[in-house]
C-alpha cells in the first residue's frame, strides 16, 4: 500500500493540449470541472494558464510579487484537482501588457489543440466582451467559450 501523494497522471506522447486561460484572481469551479471532463474525454493535457497584466510603467520582466502570490494558489488548486481526476496537467503563468498580449505570447511559444475560454458576467474577473470577440477571431485553434449559469445546480448544492 502506498501512502502520500498520488503520482501525477502521465500524458501520452503527442497528447492533445487543452488551454484554459484565466485572470482576475478567480477560476470558476464550473469551468474547471468542464475543463477536466473535456481533457479526460480527449485524453488531453489540461493547461491552466494564469495571465498577468504588466503595466507599461514597469519593465515586462519585472518581479510582480503580489500577482504571483494571487496566481500560484489558484494554479496549485487546479493542478491538485486535475491530479485527483487523473488528468495530466501542465500549468502556466504568462505576462503581457494586456490579456490579449499575454495570450498572444503564450500562443507564440506553445501548441494547443483546444481552448476553453471562461466567460464571466463580471468583466472585472477577467475577459471583457472585446477580449472575448478578439480571442474567438484570432485563436489559433478550436475555441469554446463557457459562461456558467447563475443559480446553477452546483451553486444551489453548495449553499
Please report, for each region that a protein language model flagged, where it lies by residue:
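Extended, non-globular alpha-helical segments
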Residues: 1-11, 63-71, 78-79, 83, ...
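Gly/Ser-rich helix-loop-strand patches that form or flank binding pockets
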Residues: 1-8, 34, 108-159
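Small/aliphatic-rich secondary-structure junction motif
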Residues: 7-65, 90, 138-149, 159
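A conditional alpha-helix N-cap/helix-loop micro-motif detector
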Residues: 28, 71, 96-97, 125
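Amphipathic coiled-coil/heptad-repeat helices and related helical stalk/stem segments
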Residues: 28-32, 99-100, 128-129
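Well-ordered alpha-helical segments embedded in enzymatic catalytic cores
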Residues: 31-34, 74-77, 102
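CheY-like receiver
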Residues: 38, 102-106
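Charged docking surfaces used in two-component/phosphorelay signaling
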Residues: 93-102
Amino acid at each position: 500500500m502506498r501512502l502520500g501523494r498520488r503520482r501525477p497522471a502521465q500524458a501520452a506522447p503527442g497528447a492533445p493540449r487543452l488551454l484554459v486561460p484565466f485572470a482576475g484572481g478567480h477560476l470558476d469551479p464550473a469551468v474547471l470541472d468542464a475543463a477536466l471532463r473535456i481533457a479526460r474525454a480527449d485524453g488531453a493535457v489540461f493547461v491552466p494558464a494564469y495571465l498577468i497584466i504588466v503595466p507599461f510603467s514597469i519593465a515586462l520582466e519585472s518581479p510582480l510579487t503580489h500577482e504571483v502570490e494571487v496566481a500560484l494558489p489558484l494554479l496549485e488548486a487546479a493542478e491538485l484537482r486535475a491530479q485527483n481526476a487523473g488528468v495530466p496537467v501542465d500549468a502556466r503563468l504568462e505576462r503581457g501588457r494586456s490579456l490579449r498580449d499575454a495570450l498572444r505570447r503564450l500562443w507564440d511559444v506553445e501548441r494547443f489543440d483546444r481552448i476553453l475560454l471562461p466567460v464571466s458576467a463580471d468583466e472585472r474577473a477577467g475577459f471583457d466582451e472585446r477580449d472575448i470577440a478578439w480571442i474567438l477571431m484570432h485563436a489559433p485553434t478550436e475555441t469554446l467559450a463557457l459562461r456558467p449559469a447563475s443559480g446553477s445546480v452546483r451553486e444551489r448544492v453548495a449553499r
